[in-house]
Every structure is written in structure tokens, then in C-alpha cells.
Amino acid sequence: MGNTIIDGLKERISNAISVNQSVGIMLPGNNYSDLTQALFEFMNSKPKTAWVYVTITNPYGSIEKKFGDMFDKGNIRFIDGISRAAGIYEINPNCVFIESPSQLEKILLEIMNAFRDLENNIQKYLVIDSLSSLLTYNDVSLVTEFFTHLSNRTKLEDIHSISLSIEEEMEENISKILYLKSNKIIKVRESFI
């Protein structure tokens, strides 16, 4: 059953991001693990693309432990906004560690730096994991401003984006801006993928 769910999620993500520049994914918390597995399998299946994965939800070390075998193609870079805040101090050449998830300007700067040196003909993708986690550390208005600015920059730079949000943790204003700034919204339900 788990593979069916993951395969269904991969197909929905692939279909959505191939025709839309920005995709918002709203999901219940209990589907988060399946969704992240589907995302990493999808990223791994696209070795000639460049991905930047911004994690506020889980430390890079735990992501590497679970999905590290999918990073060997060298097309996925990470920006970790949670490890340092949790007291985890590691160094990894594949990851930029931000001191705190409240440093939204620094996160934005590192995202744009990660894409800056790539060739123009490479398709670029950004994953934000997750908007709802940013709300734990930041005021709603700051997250709204950050996401609006990020969305505008990625569109100008021709970077496709996937923004995750956990339904149970979302504020109404952030949900509205996610709908406004995303070309496509995928709503994951527990019973239907």
C-alpha cells in the first residue's frame, strides 16, 4: 500500500511541476513521510536538473540518514534552517546551515546563491519544507512577506518551486498567499492520493 501512495504522489508532483512554475502542496501531517519520500524519489529520477531543498521541518542529518542514497547524483543541495537552532553543529559540503529559522533574509539569500552559478540551460527547482514550520519561528506577516518575495524572485529567475504546508499547522493568511502565489495546488487527503 505504501508504494502505491508514494507512486501516486510522485505522479501528481511530476505532472504538476512539469506544467506549472510554482506548486503548493497542502497535506495532513500523517502523510508527510510519504510525501517527502515521493519528493526525493522524484528528484533522484531527474539527475540533469538542479534542486535546492530548504528544510525547516527536519535537520539535514536526519534527511541524509533516511534518503542519503538518493543524493549521490549531485543534483540536490540543501539549506538547513533548523539544525543550528536545535543545537546540532555539523558541517557538510552539500548543505548550508542557517543559524535560525527566523533568519528569513539569510534563507532567501542562500537560496538565490545556490542557483546563481548554475548554467542557464539547466532546469532549476526549489522545495520549501515547509511554510507551516516557518510559522513556528516567525510571525505570520513575516512569513507572508518572505514567501511573496521568494515567489516573485523564483518566477523572475525561472526557478520552479514546490512549497509544502501541513494543513493542521497553517494560518489562514499563509494559506491564502499559498493559493495566490502558486500556479497549482495539490491537496493530499488521507484517503485519496
Predicted regions and their residues:
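Substrate-engagement module of ASCE P-loop NTPases
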Residues: 143-169
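Nucleotide-state-sensitive switch-loop elements of NTP-binding domains
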Residues: 70-98
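Glycine-rich P-loop/Walker A and Walker A-like loops and their local beta1-loop-alpha1 context
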Residues: 2-66
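Phosphate-binding/switch loop-helix module in NTP-utilizing enzymes
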Residues: 87-149
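Short, charged/polar "capping" segments at the starts of alpha-helices
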Residues: 59-64, 86-87, 170-173
